[in-house]
Amino acid sequence: MLRWLTAGESHGPSLVAILEGLPAHVQVTSDDVADALARRRLGYGRGARMKFERDEVTLVGGIRHGETMGGPVAIEIGNTEWPKWEKVMAADPVDPVELESLARNAPLTRPRPGHADLVGMQKYDFTEARPILERASARETAARVALGRVASNLLEQAVGARIVSHVIELGGVRAPAGLWPQPEDVDRLDDDPVRCLDADTSKLMVEAIDQAHQDGDTLGGVVEVVVHGLPPGLGSHVHWDRRLDARLAGALMGIQAIKGVEVGDGFELAATPGSRAHDEIVSGTDGLRRVSGRSGGTEGGMSTGEVLRVRAAMKPIATVPRALRTVDVATGEAAVAHHQRSDVCAVPAAGIVAEAMVALVLADAVLEKFGGDSVRETRRNAEGYLDTLRFR
């Protein structure tokens, strides 16, 4: 079983991520992790922070000479802006007189609608939002993306599965239906300003972002994660918490700003007659296959062996330049929310984070099904399982 944990704040010295339960000999390097983190910064409409933020990756433990050793993997991602924040975010006490002179330490008492600010202050008994927003920030997803790269490497090396994501909707502009990216499309997608497969749609999405920026607004959208090469039988039908689609949905909903998830054609199936909603099964030269992919590659809480597709809907960024109404909790008076630099749209980056979460869930499911203390053992077990399937 895989377990993962992250720690750290948006403006703290670093983020730390730990992944436990990996077999030995998963090939992974600091360059792999750095590449994944660079992809997280992609996308038209990102804020100024993406221009100067750099992720300093240190593989702290669990990896030797480019291979995991079977113990927990620990990754640290340094914050290059830490010198600006070392007094405000210091772990040890700082002289109150010195803190009062720092503009960055001004109390954040005007909670932002759509953020964790207000309810976090209520729940954890804080008088201002800084202790809440620092951890609630999407900066934390960098740690998950780092772990997701390790999980992705395991999936490819153990069972040959590969993951790719793309943007299918942004600001109300939707790509044509039925476009499913292949693993070889990754570079082309990453070169597109909004990571959309359709060039004409991409141009319209960029125009929508430009208009939102001009209007002082933000935009959301929908990303789709596609997984090729999964074996059938990951997950289980026997308990709710072992169902693969439930685990995927929970992982995606755990990404900041995600408000909805669907597997396959999801909500569209609610309006489709049963005679057309399900993937019929046929027998061909390559064995049993489903003639469509409406289910998204899962049935009964298990992977079917077909292409897996999951979608996540991201709400618009809650830090809106056109400041929203709020209440100053220090005075009880009506006010406008705090505003700081932010993205106009982070939907393309959300796809990279979604890839990471899907990879972590699937890697856990693969190890649950096939076990193994080394990648070779996991791969051998998976191959033996496929060779002995009663129905193929």
From Swiss-Prot:
InterPro entries: Chorismate_synth (IPR000453), Chorismate_synth_AroC_sf (IPR035904), Chorismate_synthase_CS (IPR020541). Pfam families: Chorismate_synt (PF01264). One of its GO terms (biological process) is amino acid biosynthetic process. The keyword Lyase applies. Pathway: Metabolic intermediate biosynthesis; chorismate biosynthesis; chorismate from D-erythrose 4-phosphate and phosphoenolpyruvate: step 7/7. One of its GO terms (cellular component) is cytosol. Reduced FMN (FMNH(2)). Disulfide bonds: none annotated. This is Chorismate synthase. NADP(+) binds at R40, R46. Keywords: Amino-acid biosynthesis, Aromatic amino acid biosynthesis, FAD, Flavoprotein, FMN, Lyase, NADP. The gene is aroC. Its EC number is 4.2.3.5. Belongs to the chorismate synthase family. Its cofactor is FMNH2. Homotetramer. FMN binds at R135, A136, S137, Q256, A257, G300, K315, P316, I317, A318, T319, R341. It catalyses: 5-O-(1-carboxyvinyl)-3-phosphoshikimate = chorismate + phosphate. This reaction introduces a second double bond into the aromatic ring system. Gene3D superfamilies: Chorismate synthase AroC (3.60.150.10). Signal peptide: none annotated. GO terms for molecular function: chorismate synthase activity; FMN binding.
